[in-house]
């Protein structure tokens, strides 16, 4: 059941938080951590791609995909296409971000998949990919019957929100893990970089909260030109 809040009323805050989070992670990675690179003698530059791609590419674009489906006053076929494409881009960038972490670890001779953050991350990206593939087949092409779509919709929405919330929580865990490593290496616990990392995590969590709120809010009224098949309410869709 939708919360009695119009989705348009909360999307502005979500978009603003997304911009702030993106700027903060870029400032951290470029100004404090030295920049971004796929090939570099300084392997830390390779790792810097990981938080940038996972936050901007995976968390923010994934959130914008959810928001777009709930807040855009467009016909449902158009919203479905935008929703699908944004999630595909988010998934691709998320995979690229994980590859950057593996590349950094391999070239720095650091073990892979030893932390809770990495375990949850692999689980999240796997569930996200599974959700996208089955959603493409059922809701987009070739598409299931109206009864099949209606029956799977609650599970589609519930799994989508679960995966997204898990992704946001794991992002916060990743910031904490990296900050702990840096502090163990001598970073000032009360320095500007430590505060920047912590506040980036907080903004990320707030963005995720507003995305979930948008997904639970009422959608704009559908256009009267939408066909009967598309009049089925897919507005609670999360992925």
UniProtKB/Swiss-Prot annotation:
Residues 217-239 are annotated as: Disordered. Keywords: Electron transport, Heme, Iron, Membrane, Metal-binding, Translocase, Transmembrane, Transmembrane helix, Transport, Vacuole. It is found in: Vacuole membrane. Heme b 2 binds at residues 83, 156. Heme b 1 binds at residues 50, 117. Its main location: membrane. Gene3D superfamilies: 1.20.120.1770. Residues 13-216 form the Cytochrome b561 domain. Its EC number is 7.2.1.3. Residues 29-45, 103-119, 177-193 are lumenal. It catalyses: Fe(3+)(out) + L-ascorbate(in) = monodehydro-L-ascorbate radical(in) + Fe(2+)(out) + H(+). The chain crosses the membrane at residues 8-28, 46-66, 82-102, 120-140, 156-176, 194-214. Homodimer. Two-heme-containing cytochrome. Catalyzes ascorbate-dependent trans-membrane ferric-chelate reduction. Able to use dihydrolipoic acid (DHLA) as an alternative substrate to ascorbate. This is Transmembrane ascorbate ferrireductase 1. It comes from Arabidopsis thaliana.
């Amino acid at each position: 059941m939708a919360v009695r809040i119009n989705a348009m009323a909360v999307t502005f805050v979500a978009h603003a938080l997304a911009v702030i989070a993106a700027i903060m992670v870029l400032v951290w990675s470029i100004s404090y951590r030295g920049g971004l690179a796929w090939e570099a003698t300084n392997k830390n530059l390779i790792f810097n791609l990981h938080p940038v791609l996972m936050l901007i590419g995976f968390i923010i674009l994934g959130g914008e995909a959810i928001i777009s489906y709930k807040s855009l006053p467009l016909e449902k076929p158009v919203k479905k296409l935008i929703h699908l494409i944004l999630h595909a881009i988010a998934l691709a960038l998320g995979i690229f971000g994980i590859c950057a972490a593996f590349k950094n670890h391999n070239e720095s001779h650091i073990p892979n998949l030893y932390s809770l953050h990495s375990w949850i991350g692999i689980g999240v990206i796997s569930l996200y990919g599974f959700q996208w593939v089955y959603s493409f087949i059922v809701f987009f092409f070739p598409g299931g019957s109206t009864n099949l779509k209606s029956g799977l919709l609650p599970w589609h929405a519930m799994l989508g929100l679960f995966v997204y919330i898990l992704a946001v929580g794991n992002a916060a865990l990743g910031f904490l893990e990296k900050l702990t490593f840096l502090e163990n290496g001598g970073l000032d616990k009360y320095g500007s970089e430590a505060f920047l990392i912590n506040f980036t995590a907080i903004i990320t969590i707030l963005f995720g909260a507003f995305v979930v709120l948008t997904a639970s809010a009422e959608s704009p009224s559908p256009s009267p030109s939408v066909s009967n098949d598309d009049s089925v309410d897919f507005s609670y869709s999360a992925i």
